[in-house]
């Protein structure tokens, strides 16, 4: 009889554990304030943003995108996508009506047709 009570208690404990785990469901959304994004953050300084290779359409107004690939995106990038590699290869997918100033002395700006 005591063995039967232990089985019932174990089942009850397992059920309570699973219910408590299910009640605290993990939120699978991307949280931009998570620890890892704070560690890898480029900052929010738009004034220091730069881009060596900016592609723009010939539309009026133009739609421009920085296509630099590096270990991080420029500081004003909102949509930075990084490959899972070492070192990381990151590219910004934001579009603007302008290009940021060049990061280096040789400014390269290419214009593509819309």
UniProtKB/Swiss-Prot annotation:
Record-level Gene Ontology MF annotations: serine-type endopeptidase inhibitor activity
UniProt tissue specificity: Seed.
An example Gene Ontology CC term for this record: extracellular region
Positions of the record's site feature: Reactive bond for trypsin: 58-59
One Pfam family of this chain: Bowman-Birk_leg
Residue ranges listed under propeptide: 29-42
Alphabetical UniProt keywords: Disulfide bond, Protease inhibitor, Serine protease inhibitor, Signal
Xref: InterPro entries: Bowman-Birk_prot_inh, Prot_inh_BBI
Keyword Cell division: no
Site (Reactive bond for chymotrypsin): 84-85
Signal sequence range: 1-28
Cysteine pairings via disulfide bonds: 50-103, 51-66, 54-99, 56-64, 73-80, 77-92, 82-90
Functional description taken from the UniProt entry: Inhibitor of trypsin and of chymotrypsin. May function as a natural phytochemical defense against predators.
Family listed: Belongs to the Bowman-Birk serine protease inhibitor family.
Protein name as it appears in the record: Seed trypsin/chymotrypsin inhibitor TI5-72
Organism: Pisum sativum (Garden pea)
Name of the encoding gene: TI572
């Amino acid at each position: 009889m005591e063995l039967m009570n232990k089985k019932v208690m174990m089942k009850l404990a397992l059920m309570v554990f699973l219910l408590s785990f299910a009640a605290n469901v993990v939120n699978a959304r991307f949280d931009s304030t998570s620890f890892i994004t704070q560690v890898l953050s480029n900052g929010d300084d738009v004034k220091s943003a730069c881009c060596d290779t900016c592609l723009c359409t010939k539309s009026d107004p133009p739609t421009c995108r920085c296509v630099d690939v590096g270990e991080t995106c420029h500081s004003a990038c909102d949509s930075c996508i990084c490959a899972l590699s070492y070192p990381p290869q990151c590219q910004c997918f934001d579009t603007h009506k302008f290009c940021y100033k060049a990061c280096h002395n040789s400014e390269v700006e290419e214009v593509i047709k819309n």
